[in-house]
């Protein structure tokens, strides 16, 4: 038997008013409204939220505000990101800016007019302490650099991440607001040069190389390995761990053509074997679409960064035209004046440039 809570009479049809059972007669005599969400009648003042007529309880429990933009949402359609309720737009934005898992690369997009001759940068940055959300700082730096970059977790870093660009042609890559990004990272206690692990790696599209020019470039890096370690700000132990030499030396009476063929054959076999351990060379050739130069240490110094990129690009370009493998003047032809001054300050390639006093 069910009785009306207001008149006490037995009722066959159950109505819920303010959480209590009432008969039809009492319901009709009472000012009320039907909540669109819980389906119950209420005598209290109704509320209109997002075109829904709702009770006080549903107003408080069935709606949330997006933590990022403040938009009011139904709880059942809001997306939970960690401990925050988000609208779909803000959720997708956070996904876009968050630090991706290792090898969770997005679909590549090529930036710039030259779609064949492209470059990519991988810059590792780290923090001395773990305070703060890495995704927050990832969002900050990616909002500066734009859609042509993303961040990724790297196991060699303690509290940082790797900044990776999509393929860019030379002009598009250098046009990115690197200086502003470096200032942001430095302001938030990120470091790159002042660490033992951070590197600056550059990828060059394979379309820029012939079999011969790739062998030539590899010989240049090997022949000048100790000098380039200095230019790259690496210690010998760090270079040996992350960007080691192949130790190609000319045999007695070996001509340039002969050593080029010997190196090219070795690199062919290396790419064919595709062993993970072989990627840790100064010139990494095992990737299908790019050649990776791994020797540079990471940096958040804008001038050092530009000098490093200019050096790598210039050597890759000159590998097509060099006629004497041991003539560093040919190899270094076309460097920007700022890069030459940086080389002098590092006391590198003194056979080509007169060095002068300086530091980093």
Where are these regions (language model features)?
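Cys/His-rich microdomains that often coordinate metals
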Residues: 11, 30, 42, 62, ...
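Short cysteine-rich clusters marking metal-coordination/redox-active sites
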Residues: 4-7, 23, 35-38, 55, ...
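Histidine-centered divalent-metal-coordination microenvironment in nucleic-acid enzymes
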Residues: 160-162, 193-209, 290-294
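Terminal catalytic/cofactor-binding subdomain
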Residues: 67-71, 79-189
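Short Cys/His-rich "knuckle" micro-motifs
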Residues: 14-17, 33-34, 45-48, 65-66, ...
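Aromatic/basic-lined ligand-recognition segments
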Residues: 120, 215-297
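Cysteine-rich micro-motifs
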Residues: 17-28, 48-60, 80-92
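Helical (often loop-to-helix) elements that flank the catalytic cores of nucleotide-handling enzymes
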Residues: 137, 171-182, 207-233, 301-316, ...
């Amino acid at each position: 038997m069910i009785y009306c809570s207001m008149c006490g009479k037995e009722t066959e049809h159950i109505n819920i008013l303010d959480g209590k059972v009432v008969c039809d007669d009492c319901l009709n005599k009472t000012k009320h409204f039907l909540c669109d969400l819980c389906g119950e009648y209420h005598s209290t003042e109704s509320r209109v939220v997002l075109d829904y007529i709702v009770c006080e309880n549903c107003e408080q429990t069935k709606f949330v505000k997006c933590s990022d933009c403040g938009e009011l949402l139904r709880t059942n359609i809001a997306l939970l990101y960690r401990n925050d309720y988000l609208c779909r737009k803000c959720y997708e934005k956070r996904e876009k800016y968050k630090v991706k898992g290792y090898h969770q690369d997005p679909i590549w997009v090529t930036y710039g007019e030259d779609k064949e001759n492209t470059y990519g940068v991988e810059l590792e940055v780290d923090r001395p302490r773990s305070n703060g959300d890495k995704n927050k700082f990832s969002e900050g730096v990616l909002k500066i650099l734009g859609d042509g970059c993303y961040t990724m977790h790297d196991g060699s870093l303690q509290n940082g991440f790797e900044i990776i660009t999509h393929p860019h042609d030379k002009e598009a890559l250098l046009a990115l607001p690197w200086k502003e990004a470096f200032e942001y990272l430095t302001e938030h206690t990120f470091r790159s040069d002042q660490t033992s692990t951070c590197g600056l790696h550059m990828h060059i599209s394979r379309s820029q190389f012939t079999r011969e020019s790739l062998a030539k470039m590899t010989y240049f890096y090997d022949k000048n390995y100790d000098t380039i370690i200095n230019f790259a700000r690496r210690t010998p132990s760090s270079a040996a761990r992350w960007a080691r030499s192949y130790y190609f030396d000319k045999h007695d009476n070996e001509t340039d053509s002969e050593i080029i063929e010997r190196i090219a054959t070795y690199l062919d076999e290396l790419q064919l074997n595709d062993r993970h351990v072989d990627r840790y060379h100064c010139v990494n050739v095992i990737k299908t679409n790019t050649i990776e130069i791994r020797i540079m240490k990471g940096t958040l110094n804008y001038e050092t960064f530009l000098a490093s990129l200019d050096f790598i690009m210039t050597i890759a370009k000159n590998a097509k035209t060099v006629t004497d493998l041991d003539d560093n003047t040919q190899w270094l032809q076309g460097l920007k004046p700022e890069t030459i001054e940086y080389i002098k300050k590092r006391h590198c390639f003194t056979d080509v440039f007169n060095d002068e006093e300086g530091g980093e």
